[in-house]
Amino acid sequence: MNLIPQKIKERVAQYVLQFSPQVDRLRSGSSLRQMKSMVLVYADHDEAKYKLVRDIATYIKKEYGVKRVMRVAYIDEESKFIPAWHLRKLETDYFCKSDLNWFGKPVSNVNPLMQEPFDVLIHFDPDSSVPLDFFVMASKAKMKVSNHSKLRTKDYDILLPTTKGDNWKQRNHRIIQFLAESPLS
């Protein structure tokens, strides 16, 4: 039985997220070819998206020589309903409703990932879910990049504008292209 209605939980979560302070972290920019580690954060809905993000991670490793490309997904299900194809592996992790506190903040298995100082965090689905926004806020990544975000712009170092008519794949390809061609060092 759910004692607190979902709408109230969502509003409390948005409020807490909005007024949460920024995390102290070492900020540093670099181009994709100079990076040693990165984390790709996304909302997972189906196996096709899982495979697409896996392919993006493989492409980044092969094309740009990034040694570690971690993928972290938020799955909006209880742990007992997690699909069989979504396993925790060496460079793949997820968190789900069972891993959140009552207002949607991740509190269990992803905490070590939030503390790890990745060279860059790329958020593929900004504003898609409060738990992902909490993850991004708490991350100690040296650089945080995403497409335009309405909720927590202060958490990102680089926000790329979206173009009308873009699909998910085009928007996120633009992020990778920007990081590959950027003069950051």
Question: Positions of the model-derived regions?
Answer:
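Short hydrophobic segments within beta-strands
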Residues: L40-A43, V72-Y74
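Gly/Ser/Thr-rich loops at beta-strand to alpha-helix junctions
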Residues: D44-A48, S128-V130
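Short N-terminal or domain-adjacent regulatory/targeting segments
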Residues: N2-S37, E47-K51
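Active-site-proximal region of nucleotide-activated glycan assembly enzymes
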Residues: M1-K7, T153-S185
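Histidine-anchored nucleotide/phosphate-binding helix
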Residues: D46-G65
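Active-site and donor-binding regions of nucleotide-sugar-utilizing enzymes
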Residues: Y94-T163
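Short, charged/polar "capping" segments at the starts of alpha-helices
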Residues: A48-K49, E77-I82, T153-K154
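Conserved nucleotide-cofactor-binding alpha/beta core module
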Residues: K61-M114
